[in-house]
């Protein structure tokens, strides 16, 4: 993980008290807005000015939701389902989540890192065990948990076909969702199909390819917008959100709508 990404993680923790304070103020001032919380990794996380043009899909999701559905993006660079728990980040979400809210959980990129015991989980055992803690925590507070399979990386074989990169993790999540009776957003399958349709060259315009970096994991604004659109469509398809709660599913969303705030000191 680069220095920039470590700084982003620190900034996210620093912002937590402000986020909780703002939530408390909003609740005291009037009717409670329904909130969709995101627990995830760098592919979904808020990015700051020093990381631009890298963009998490969570930054683009509000463009596809009506204003009465707020987005609280708690995703943080470099986290797995395990390390997010161990650092107390789920506890922060559970301190503010409530009835009618949604907890969207998407992990696997860093769960796959077998060389790092602080992050690694095994798909059919510890990965599922960790995910259950998110499901149980949301349910205990009257919120709705939702699982999203991990968005695919940009990887093609010699024949130009997009290939999956997440091993058994998507299958393990699908099985858990079925066993637990929770909605599943199959972003892994949908993003793989999207990269296949776009092809080797055009997908470069969706990922964080710059003059100095060829990043096949993280997105630029068009890529984040495309993935957020997939997420919003799945939220509608699975009836997690109602038709009145989504918008622009088939409309162009300009990349210029993405902005990067300065990182918190």
Label each PLM-derived region with a short phrase.
Residues 89-221, 225, 229-248, 259-263:
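Alpha-helical cap/lid subdomain in secreted, periplasmic
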Residues 20, 27-75, 90-99:
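Serine-esterase "nucleophile elbow" of acetyl-processing enzymes
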Residues 74-78, 119-120:
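Short, basic, glycine/proline-bearing loop/turn elements
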Residues 44-45, 78-80, 152-153:
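Short histidine/acidic/glycine/proline-rich micro-motifs that form metal-
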Residues 80-88:
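Structural motif
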Residues 2, 7-28:
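N-terminal export signals
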Residues 250-253:
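Secreted/periplasmic serine-hydrolase-like ester/acetyl group-modifying domain
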């Amino acid at each position: 993980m680069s220095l920039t990404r470590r700084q982003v993680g620190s900034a996210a923790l620093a912002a937590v008290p402000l986020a909780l304070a703002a939530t408390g103020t909003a609740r005291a001032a009037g009717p409670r807005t329904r909130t969709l919380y995101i627990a995830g990794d760098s592919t979904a996380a808020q990015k700051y000015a020093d990381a631009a043009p890298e963009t998490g899909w969570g930054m683009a999701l509000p463009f596809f939701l009506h204003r009465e559905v707020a987005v609280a993006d708690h995703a943080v660079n470099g986290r797995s389902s395990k390390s997010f728990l161990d650092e107390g980040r789920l506890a922060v979400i559970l301190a503010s989540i409530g009835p009618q809210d949604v907890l969207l959980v998407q992990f696997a990129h860093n769960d796959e890192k077998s060389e790092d015991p602080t992050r690694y989980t095994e798909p059919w055992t510890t990965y599922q065990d960790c995910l259950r803690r998110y499901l149980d925590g949301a349910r205990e507070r009257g919120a709705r948990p939702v699982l999203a399979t991990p968005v695919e990386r940009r990887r093609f074989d010699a024949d130009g076909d997009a290939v999956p990169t997440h091993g058994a993790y998507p299958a393990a999540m699908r099985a858990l969702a079925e066993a637990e009776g929770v909605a599943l957003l199959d972003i892994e399958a949908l993003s793989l199909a999207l990269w296949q349709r776009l092809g080797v060259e055009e997908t470069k315009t969706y990922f964080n390819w710059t003059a100095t970096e060829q990043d096949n994991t993280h997105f630029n604004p068009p890529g984040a917008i495309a993935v957020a659109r997939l997420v919003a469509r799945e939220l509608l398809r699975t009836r997690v959100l109602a038709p009145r709660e989504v918008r622009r599913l088939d409309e162009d969303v300009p990349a210029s709508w993405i902005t990067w705030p300065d990182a918190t000191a």
